[in-house]
Amino acid sequence: FDTATHKQQWLDLNNQVFAHHPDQGNWAMADLDNRIKEDWFDPQGFFLATEKGVIEGFVWTKIHQDLVNQDPVGELYVVGTAPAHHGRGIARALSVEAINYFVTKGLKHAMLYVDADNEKGLKLYQSLGFN
């Protein structure tokens, strides 16, 4: 993820993917910029699938290091695929890449949040070992 070149395109795709989701689907550039300024933001942990410069899917990670008496935990913070590219395994491939990123950072645990009615997401995450 390159903040100079990907921000607007990612924001547009995020808002499309999560149009139905009140917390995630109506972001303005200021929302994205605020998160990029957070101490936890790492562009190396923001994975994109692109074809000819167009973002087809993404996994944005977050590492929680401020946990009391616990090791840091990696979070699959936002996962999305452009509707035209559903079913191609993009979210799976990027999620695996993100989990491998956590391993390279020495993390032993990963987590995510998913809505209970997101059947495709639940199936994907369960197949990756989340429960």
Can you say where each PLM-predicted feature lies in the sequence?
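Helical hairpin unit composed of two closely spaced alpha helices linked by a short loop
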Residues: Y77-T81, I99, K108
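A short, internal acetyl-CoA/4′-phosphopantetheine-binding micro-motif in the GNAT/acyltransferase core
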Residues: Y77-H86, D115
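Ligand-binding pocket scaffold of soluble enzyme catalytic domains
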Residues: Q8-Q9, F47, F58-V59, I90, ...
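Conserved active-site alpha-helix within GNAT-family acetyltransferase domains
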Residues: R88, R92, A116-N131
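A conserved beta-strand-loop-helix scaffold within acyl/acetyltransferase catalytic domains
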Residues: H21-V79
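A short beta-loop-alpha structural element at the N-terminal edge
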Residues: F1-D12
